[in-house]
């Protein structure tokens, strides 16, 4: 899996961004297509916001549109991240590993930690709304310069209310 590197001083330099996938910047998710099936997952930068993943909760969906929530992930400080789909289509598979070992989402975001597989309805259209690893890194550097809340605000949901 080739990777696009960044200048050592760039804020995104510490993150792996494989060049063999497409990225949806505002949601910080990626997609990789093979034989009409898109494997999707979260990016390493989003994983840093989560820091710790005690739970991945899948939403009961069969068909998804771009941006629609596939799952939510609880992170540190009770923050919940919505994992939005970068492609439209029919859900083929949810990663069963994440139920048993949710930490795989962060430990191997581009490998065993994928979130779902989707039969893409129109990959060409969806791909046009995504960016390459190089473009995502550039967007990420600009957004990180404005602050983490600005950069990751599109994926974050409100903290969960404390249990009574």
Which ranges hold each PLM region?
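Non-catalytic terminal segments and appended small domains
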Residues: 1-60, 66-69, 77-83, 90-164
């Amino acid at each position: 899996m080739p990777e696009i590197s960044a200048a050592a001083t760039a804020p995104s330099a510490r993150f792996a961004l494989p060049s063999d996938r497409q990225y949806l910047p505002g949601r910080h998710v990626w997609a990789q297509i093979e034989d009409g099936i898109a494997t999707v997952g979260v990016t390493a930068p989003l994983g840093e916001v989560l820091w710790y993943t005690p739970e991945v909760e899948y939403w009961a969906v069969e068909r998804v549109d771009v941006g629609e929530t596939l799952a939510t992930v609880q992170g540190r400080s009770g923050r919940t991240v919505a994992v939005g789909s970068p492609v439209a289509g029919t859900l083929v598979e949810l990663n069963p590993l994440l139920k048993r070992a949710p930490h795989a989402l962060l430990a191997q975001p581009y490998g065993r930690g994928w979130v779902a597989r989707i039969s893409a309805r129109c990959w060409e259209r969806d791909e046009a709304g995504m960016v390459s690893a190089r473009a995502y890194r550039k967007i990420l550097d600009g957004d990180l310069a404005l602050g983490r809340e600005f950069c990751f605000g599109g994926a974050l949901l409100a903290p969960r209310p404390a249990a009574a």
